Amino acid sequence: MGRDLDDVDRSILYLLQEDARGTSAKAMSDTIGVSASTIRNRIDQLEDDGIIRGYHPEIDYEAANIPLQVTFVISAPPTELQDYSEQIRGIQGVIDVREMLTGQRNIHVHVVGTDTNEITQITDAIHDTGAKIESSEVMRQRHVQPFNHFFLQGTEDMDARDDAVDKDDNSATE
């Protein structure tokens, strides 16, 4: 079981999900209201606890001239789920493998390729593992957003303070 996160941890996670590369500890400290060293220490602890497992770029595959993205839904025996998942992760062009907790359609695989020949090769490689492809869908677009449970703590208070400052500024000019 994981550990409980406080408001600072959740705020850090939210900001890192928005922009992990462009968000400095100083900028986060200004937004969250704690010191930059506290931010760095918390990030180190979140990494040590395995909550933050990495920092990954969001790639526009079409802009990288890899225009085809396909999602495969696969059935695998529950007792062999991890074995199939591991084999499939080793296939070139596979970028995401998700193991489902329930149901027969228990592996979802996201792949990319430059053309239908590459997608066919990936399909054949998946079949070679012994897994059964139940369906496949060509993906048009993928949208990712920060998990809203990791909302930025105190933003409501900061908005209220900004509104109060705006009112004070307006009353001073009247």
Which sequence ranges carry the predicted segments?
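A compositional/biophysical signature of low hydrophobicity enriched in polar/charged and small residues
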Residues: 1-174
